[in-house]
Amino acid sequence: VPRTNIVTGRAFNRISFYGARGAFLEQIQMFAGPTVIWRYDQFGNDPLEGSESFDLSLTARGGWRLSGHAEHDYTDIQNGDYAAYTVDRGAGQVPYAPLSSVEDGFLFSSTLTTPTWQTANASAKISRSRGVIFPEGSAGFETRLTGSLALRPTSSIRIAYSQTFSRIRRDRDGSEFA
């Protein structure tokens, strides 16, 4: 979803090491850096959200790749975004009060990717994260499994399949959000 009326600041650094041709470990890459997002009219003040991340990618002989990602996230939840929300606390409708922020969000993921062979390639990813559930202004945990398979049985036929399983649970009581 394109976002408007924001300013994004991002910096990163990459470090790469290369093994000898034919070595078991042919390449190691690391990326790290922060990302900060402000509302346009509040640029330079407290950010709306941001993260610090670290990525590590290992490429083995034959093109096999194992990647890992770690990230710390923080989000300032804007109460005005939930002004029309109400909840029934037993005595009628009252205004909904979202969390003010989620300061301790995180994301950890690992991906295994096969080489690109003449007729096929595949990948599998598992991730675990904690962050904002934006539709209700609360915090939650997500577990996600993703897989993809691409087949090229002939020079003119391509078949692609992908599947994602995602489970989001609310932080406050462990109930399922999605």
Give the ranges of each region predicted by the language model.
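Exposed, low-structure sequence patches enriched in small/polar residues
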Residues: 1-178
